[in-house]
Amino acid sequence: MFLAKAILEGADRGLGGALGGLLGGGGQARAGGGNIGGILGGIVNFISEAAAAQYTPEPPPQQQHFTVVEASESEEVRRFRQQFTQLAGPDMEVGATDLMNILNKVLSKHKELKTEGFSLDTCRSIVSVMDSDTTGKLGFEEFKYLWNNIKKWQCVFKQYDSDHSGSLGSSQLHGAMQAAGFQLNEQLYLMIVRRYADEDGGMDFNNFISCLVRLDAMFRAFKALDRDRDGLIQVSIREWLQLTMYS
């Protein structure tokens, strides 16, 4: 067994060390397409009109049987579920290719973000850190959780991209990370910049989202393992490899 020590607010160096090896994702463009344009159009409407809001990491989504949750759903969520059902197919899950098509369809409607889109490799990375049941795909609750986060983070990106360059510079990025709900120490912040920013220190939208998806997943994983809430976790080598290798 070995001990991974971290404080969730990011002030302790242990969090920087623990998360540093887990940071991955990012990538360049690959166009979405296929025969799902009509279905995607319906889903895109739910993200295109997102209101500005700050993000606070939430508990991981719980998988529930459709009949349990449908009775208490709002009309918007019910319509969203119907669109998801058409897109997901009989297994009721979406994979990395479907996710790439959806995200790039959304980005095509937001020219101000000035990004070429998400690559398939980036979407595989996003799926892996969001895939709580390790099926290699996202179920409805996982997908909805991701979707809601992207809506909020899109608003944060727009708010801090004050020069409309499509990229967050060093001074903008610090504020954007805090507005997204992540209080990071300087060591971890610099590691993130080195991993996700370009040579000039700027971070575009798809790398910003990739970074926050992974940060959110790592915070949630730590909280789940820190059962007595003392800021310490103890994991076996097998648990550590399962946590780090798949994500």
Swiss-Prot record:
Listed InterPro entries: EF-hand-dom_pair, EF_hand_dom
What highest taxon heads this organism's lineage? Answer: Eukaryota
Cellular localisation? Cytoplasm; Cell membrane
Sites where the protein binds Ca(2+) 2 = 131, 133, 135, 137, 142
Which GO cellular component terms are attached? cytoplasm; plasma membrane
Q: Which UniProt keywords apply?
A: Calcium, Cell membrane, Cytoplasm, Membrane, Metal-binding, Repeat
Q: Give a single Pfam family match.
A: EF-hand_8
Q: Does the keyword Transferase apply?
A: no
Which residues take part in binding Ca(2+) 4?
204
Q: Quick one: which residues bind Ca(2+) 3?
A: 161, 163, 165
Q: Which residues bind Ca(2+) 1?
A: 88, 91, 93
**MF GO annotations:** calcium ion binding; calcium-dependent cysteine-type endopeptidase activity
Chain ranges of the EF-hand domain: 118-151, 148-183, 184-212, 213-247
According to its UniProt entry, what is the function of this protein? Calcium-regulated non-lysosomal thiol-protease which catalyzes limited proteolysis of substrates involved in cytoskeletal remodeling and signal transduction. This small subunit may act as a tissue-specific chaperone of the large subunit, possibly by helping it fold into its correct conformation for activity.
- What quaternary structure, including any partners, is listed in this protein's UniProt entry? Heterodimer of a large (catalytic) and a small (regulatory) subunit.
Q: Which PANTHER family match?
A: CALPAIN SMALL SUBUNIT 2 (PTHR46735:SF4), CALPAIN, SMALL SUBUNIT 1 A-RELATED (PTHR46735)
- Protein name, please? Calpain small subunit 2
From which source organism is this entry?
A: Mus musculus (Mouse)
Gene name, please? Capns2
